[in-house]
Amino acid sequence: MGRSISVSFGLLVVFLSLSGTGADFDCPSGWSAYDQHCYQAVDEPKSWADAEKFCTEQANGGHLVSIDSKKEANFVAELVSQNIKETRRTDFVWIGLRVEDKRQQCSSEWSDGSSINYQNWIEAESKKCLGLEKQTRYRKWVNLNCGQPYRFTCEI
């Protein structure tokens, strides 16, 4: 009997130590959790700059989404597909990346300051801001005019 109690206690310790690994990660109401971050697809068209401003005002550390892996890209694509209403203006969704210099070279970081570790370009053009394209089920990045109003995804 003493052995089964110590085994049960050991399993309880393992369970409690694993419970803090992200399964219980809390996000504000209306946000979705993925890999220790919170995401919100916003169904209100704004220019890239206004969308970035909106995201920074939502929560401390908020920005337009930065996509660091294929898994995160798939999560964001599903989030957008499920939360953005189908209209003529849903062909594109802003992400937090834009061209910063005059030679149209991509900036070396996302709007949140993180490095670019993953890329999924559909084509290179002379427009400065990037978004996800509906035709690719929101999985490929396309250059867009920064002043155009599109839906967007915030991340904290």
Swiss-Prot record:
Assigned keywords, A-Z: Disulfide bond, Hemostasis impairing toxin, Secreted, Signal, Toxin
Compartment(s) where it occurs, according to its Swiss-Prot or TrEMBL record: Secreted
Transmembrane segments: none
Signal peptide location: 1-23
Chief subcellular location: secreted
Pfam families membership: Lectin_C (PF00059)
Listed SUPFAM superfamilies: C-type lectin-like (SSF56436)
Domain of life: Eukaryota
Stretches assigned to the C-type lectin domain: 34-155
Tissue and organ distribution: Expressed by the venom gland.
Assigned protein family: Belongs to the snaclec family.
Remarks, miscellaneous: Shows greater sequence similarity to the alpha than beta subunits compared to other heterodimer snaclecs.
PANTHER family in the record: MANNOSE, PHOSPHOLIPASE, LECTIN RECEPTOR RELATED
Assembly information from the UniProt record: Heterodimer; disulfide-linked.
UniProt-recorded name of the protein: Snaclec A11
Source organism (scientific name): Macrovipera lebetinus
Organism taxonomic ancestry: Eukaryota, Metazoa, Chordata, Craniata, Vertebrata
